[in-house]
Each structure stands twice: as C-alpha cells, then as structure tokens.
C-alpha cells in the first residue's frame, strides 16, 4: 500500500508532492531502463516485520481451530474468521512490501491494496460478530445452544466477508486515484471518498460495539447480583467478580479503539498532501490490532492453551479433555 501521496513508497515526482505512477513499469521502458526501485525506509521495514508477526500468530490460530475437531462451536468459527482476516492482512503487508521494493509492480500493488482493505474490513467485521455472539449468549442464554445459533453464525460470516469483499474490490475495479491524484487520500491509491466510506463504516461498527458491550456489562452485573443473592455471597465478592468482568471488557474495547481510532480519524482529516509520516504513525497501531487479537480472543482460552501445550509435548489434541465453553470464554 503506497501509504501517502508524498510517501517514499509513492515514487515522488520531482518538485511536487504528487505521485509519479509512470515511474513504476516494466524492466525496460520505451526510452530505456525503468527508474530504479525505491529504497525502503525504516517504517516500511517495521510494517513488513509487523505483517510477518501477524501472519505467524494468526496462522497458528487457524491451524489450531482447523486441526481440532472440538473447536467447531459457533464462537470458534467467529474466532477463526477473525484469525483468517488478520492472517490475510499480515500476508498482504509482507507481499506489498515485496511488490513495491522488490518487484516494482504497480498492478500487483493495487491488487494487494484491495486485499488489505478486504482483510482489515473482515477483521473489524469479525470483531463485531464476536461481540454480537457474546451479547446473544447472555441475553438468550437458554436458547443459545441451538441450531438457530449455528445458522445465525453462518449468516453473520457471510455478511462480514461479503461486505469486506465488496469494499476490497472497489479500488481494484475502478474506485482509486490513479487517474486523478488530487482525489487521493492519505493512503495511495485509495481515493479520499473511499477512505471516508471506510471510516464511516468503522465508526458505525465501533458505536454498535460500544452499545453491545454496555448491555453486556448490565447483564453481567445483574446476573452476578442474582447469583450472589442465591448463594448468600458477601457483597465484596460480588463486587470483585463484577469489577473483574467489566475490566476485561474495557480492555478488549479499549485495545480496539486505541489501535484503530488514530488512523480512522486521520483518514477523515488528511488528504494527498498530508505528511506520509503521519500515515505510518497512525497505521502501525492498526496493524497491532491484528497482532493482539489472537492473544485476546484465542490464546487466553484455556482449551486453546491445552492444545498448544499438547502440540509442544507432541500429544494428540483428540486426547485432551475439553470443558464446556461459552462465548464469554473467548
């Protein structure tokens, strides 16, 4: 992804802040050798390293879920969707680095920009689906474990990936700024309008997640109070348990906001002439979200930890005793 119209990745025109796309071409141009490939800057290398770490983490999660028959519950399908999306995002960052600095292919770079847009959109959409699943598991606790839940999960996955695919195809098909550099946003070759659409979609998802987590906190507090009364627990015990649950939800939502809000706001405020360094500084935390998602939604789960331990000890995951699971465990 050529992160800014003034970015070193964007092959700057001499004396201007616009992108000279014509400098990316075949090995031999019509009048001689093509321009040399750009040299990566420190932040380009950092993004590539981040993509590598993201790919490795999420590939491990995908392998665990696919290779463990016990992980076929709806909640693990959603976590698997999140891991696949983040895996694609990590691979997209690495391949884009290669496309820009090793191959010099503008066409490949454009396709990878679409892949990254699709992957990050699917990642955020999967986070929303996980939040919806958590809420419904508490709100409809008695009917959650039914065929309806499985059907609903597949519907949510279809909507998430269908929407992500649509937004990812837009820059590849036509909605880009290759022919009109003045319409570029902070991420070349995505147009300003495309970035605005993505930003609005993010704020809608974030608003829904805020509302759902607020409802989850209310339900958790009410359930904890009822359990405390039934078991005659001390108020202090009820308070500690409730506070711990709310703190966990706050960490989950806070991490998501801290990673994505800076870049989303910058997409709305910046344009093609904005300093590319700001794009890197706001985009890098967004990639960290794909890095911490496996920790929050997979590796904290005790059953996943058992599988990891079994793999390290060369044991079969089919022999591992799994406890009953609920979405709140993920």
UniProtKB/Swiss-Prot annotation:
- Residues bearing glycans: 20
Cellular component GO terms, alphabetical: cytoplasm; plasma membrane
Q: Which residues cross the membrane?
A: 43-62, 75-98, 111-132, 154-173, 199-217, 246-272, 278-299
The conditions that induce or repress this protein are given as: Upon cold exposure by a lipolytic signal in thermogenic adipose tissue.
Primary location class = membrane
Keywords, A to Z, come to: Cell membrane, G-protein coupled receptor, Glycoprotein, Lipoprotein, Membrane, Palmitate, Phosphoprotein, Receptor, Transducer, Transmembrane, Transmembrane helix
Provide Cytoplasmic-side residue ranges: 63-74, 133-153, 218-245, 300-330
Gene3D superfamilies (UniProt xref): Rhodopsin 7-helix transmembrane proteins
Kindly list the residues that the UniProt entry marks as S-palmitoyl cysteine lipid attachment points.
Answer: 313
Q: In which tissues is it expressed?
A: Expressed predominantly in the central nervous system, and at low levels in the lung, kidney, testis, ovary and eye. Highly expressed in regions of the brain implicated in the Alzheimer disease.
Q: Which GO terms describe its biological process?
A: adenylate cyclase-activating G protein-coupled receptor signaling pathway; positive regulation of cold-induced thermogenesis; regulation of meiotic nuclear division; regulation of metabolic process
What InterPro entries has UniProt attached to this entry?
Answer: GPCR_Rhodpsn, GPCR_Rhodpsn_7TM, GPR3, GPR_3/6/12_orphan
List modified residues, type Phosphoserine: 324, 326, 328
Extracellular compartment spans: 1-42, 99-110, 174-198, 273-277
Per its database record, what is this protein's job? Constitutively active G-protein coupled receptor that maintains high 3'-5'-cyclic adenosine monophosphate (cAMP) levels that a plays a role in serveral processes including meiotic arrest in oocytes or neuronal development via activation of numerous intracellular signaling pathways. Acts as an essential activator of thermogenic adipocytes and drives thermogenesis via its intrinsic G(s)-coupling activity without the requirement of a ligand. Has a potential role in modulating a number of brain functions, including behavioral responses to stress, amyloid-beta peptide generation in neurons.
What's this protein's family per the entry? Belongs to the G-protein coupled receptor 1 family.
The molecule here is called G-protein coupled receptor 3
Native species: Homo sapiens
Specify the taxonomic lineage. Answer: Eukaryota, Metazoa, Chordata, Craniata, Vertebrata
Q: Which gene encodes it?
A: GPR3
């Amino acid at each position: 992804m050529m992160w800014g119209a003034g970015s070193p990745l964007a092959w700057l025109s001499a004396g201007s802040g616009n992108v000279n796309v014509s400098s990316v071409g075949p090995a031999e141009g019509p009048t001689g050798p093509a321009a040399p490939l750009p040299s990566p800057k420190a932040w380009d290398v950092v993004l590539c390293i981040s993509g590598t770490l993201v790919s490795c983490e999420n590939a491990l999660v995908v392998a665990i879920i696919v290779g463990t028959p016990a992980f076929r519950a709806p909640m693990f399908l959603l976590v698997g969707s999140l891991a696949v999306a983040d895996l694609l995002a990590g691979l997209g960052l690495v391949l884009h680095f290669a496309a820009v600095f090793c191959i010099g292919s503008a066409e490949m770079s454009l396709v990878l920009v679409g892949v990254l847009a699709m992957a990050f959109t699917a990642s955020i959409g999967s986070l929303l689906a996980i939040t919806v699943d958590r809420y419904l598991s508490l709100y409809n606790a008695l009917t959650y474990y039914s065929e309806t839940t499985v059907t609903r999960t597949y519907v949510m996955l279809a909507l998430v990936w269908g929407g992500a695919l649509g937004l990812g195809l837009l820059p590849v098909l036509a909605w880009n700024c290759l022919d009109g550099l003045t319409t570029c946003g902070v991420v070349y070759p995505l147009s300003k309008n495309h970035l605005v659409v993505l930003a609005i979609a993010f704020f809608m998802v974030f608003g829904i997640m805020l509302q759902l987590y607020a409802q989850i906190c209310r339900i958790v507090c009410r359930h904890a109070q009822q359990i405390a009364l039934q078991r005659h627990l001390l108020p202090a015990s009820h308070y500690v348990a409730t506070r711990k649950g709310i703190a966990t939800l706050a960490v989950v939502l806070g991490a998501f906001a801290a990673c994505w809000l800076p870049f989303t706001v910058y997409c709305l405020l910046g344009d093609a002439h904005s300093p590319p360094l700001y794009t890197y500084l706001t985009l890098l935390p967004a990639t960290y979200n794909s890095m911490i998602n496996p920790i929050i939604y997979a590796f904290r789960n005790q059953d996943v930890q058992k599988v990891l331990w079994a793999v390290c000890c060369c044991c079969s995951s089919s022999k591992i005793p799994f406890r009953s699971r609920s979405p709140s465990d993920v």
